[in-house]
């Protein structure tokens, strides 16, 4: 059984969706970020960086952090979504999501909605970055129709 330490964030949802799709048995341990539960000593033993998601595979006594590593682990554990002939291209797009899509859209959301000082520079910078990300994704999707 997999234990998922979860909050309803994009990274948390990635893992819960993968668990549902793979039909791997799991249980959710909710982590309330608004109450700083990710910074409590018992959670820091699981992830010293105090971030979600994290999983424990109780069958293997394995703790994993970082959404990309967890997604790869779940794909390999379930023998799904990671065909050997396309593995490197799958990793390429996973890394694109981890290093571009997530951070840029996350920063755009943050600076557009939560920045108390309102920074037009930041909003415009991440908006332009988001346009580049969406253009790259659209171009790839067009190639694979």
Task: Identify the residue ranges that each predicted region occupies.
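GST-like domain detector, emphasizing the conserved glutathione-binding G-site
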Residues: 1-125, 131
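Hydrophobic alpha-helical bundle segments that form small-molecule/ligand-binding pockets
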Residues: 134-145
